[in-house]
Regions:
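NTP-dependent nucleotidyl-transfer catalytic core
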Residues: 1-308
């Protein structure tokens, strides 16, 4: 009724922004992890949408009395960082050496190379690298600072130096881009810290001690199907390298056990839907209450420009 409407509007105005505020979550700590874009390049529109969703959800939870921490998980370890380093190294060698044939030869079979743009003058790159302009810019700026100092260095040293230079710049860029639409994080949690602390190895050891792993084809498998997943999952490949799943388990164990949050919320794209069952299976196998993990799936959208 008009009377109710007028009274309610008056209450909203007089509350000074606290209308509807509750203490529903008083004393409960919630960690909301969102965006967590790959730090090897700039954000895409999906990351930006995830930022708006995650930050809004965090604000709603805070308004309901929860103690909320916003967290960005920095994937600064694993295959994508190796790929990042290789991409930077090739571009640096191109800029520093200037001899295309020699640089291509240093990476083996040039049949795997191709042009990244239509320009015939452009340098051919292997398929398994990042080909964006940002890689060229990083390599060029690194060369301006260091000159040809790393041309004769071994490849691993060159890649490490380039990653140590470029990765912090990318992370800083992500932080600044997010701040442009008022998203500020309490924590930037690095995946590499889980490897350095031994937490990744500890997860495999714990699951093995609990009898939840087995060996097949030289790899170590987790009995995920015993805990609601549709299949068992490889933890450690036959070459001894853990799959990405292991640090992910370690990260969620860190959230709920090591740091003791009452609830952990992940904002993920719809392409990660299958991730839910396997992560909850791993937590359950480790003796962690999997209901403490909520995964919010963000649907994909299609952007149209000029009808295309």
């Amino acid at each position: 009724s008009p009377l109710w409407f007028n009274e309610t509007v008056g209450e909203v105005i007089s509350s000074g922004g606290d209308y509807g505020k509750t203490e529903l979550g008083k004393g409960k700590r919630v960690l909301v992890e969102f965006v967590s874009a790959n730090p090897t390049g700039p954000m895409h529109i999906g990351n930006a949408r995830g930022g708006a969703l995650g930050d809004s959800l965090s604000s709603v939870l805070q308004f309901a009395g929860y103690e909320v921490e916003r967290e960005f998980y920095v994937n600064d370890a694993g295959n994508q960082i190796e790929k990042f380093g290789k991409s930077l190294s090739i571009r640096y060698m191109q800029i520093a050496d200037g001899n295309k044939a020699d640089v291509i030869a240093s990476y083996g079979d040039d049949d795997v190379c191709r042009k990244i743009f239509e320009d015939e003058e452009n340098f051919p790159m292997p398929e398994d690298v990042y080909k964006g302009v940002d890689i060229i810019e990083h390599a060029y700026n690194f060369y301006k600072i260091n000159g040809g100092e790393f041309v004769n260095a071994d490849e691993e040293s060159r890649k490490c130096a380039l990653v140590e230079y470029a990765l912090p710049l990318n992370i800083d860029g992500l932080e600044k881009d997010l701040a442009k639409y008022r998203i500020v994080y309490d924590t930037w949690f690095r995946e590499s810290s889980l490897h350095k602390s031994g937490a990744v190895k500890q997860i495999v050891d714990m699951l093995t001690e609990k009898g939840q792993t087995y060996e097949k084809d030289g790899a170590i498998w987790f009995k995920a199907s015993d805990f609601g997943d549709d299949q068992d999952r490889v933890l450690v490949r036959a070459n001894g390298i853990p799959t990405y799943f292991v640090p992910d388990i370690a990260y969620h164990y860190n959230k709920l056990v090591t740091r003791g949050f009452d609830k952990a919320i992940d904002i993920l794209g719809a392409d990660h839907h299958g991730y839910i069952a396997r992560m909850k299976a791993a937590l359950t196998a480790l003796g962690v209450d999997a209901s403490k993990l909520d995964i919010v799936i963000m649907q994909m959208v299609m952007l149209v420009r000029n009808g295309e």
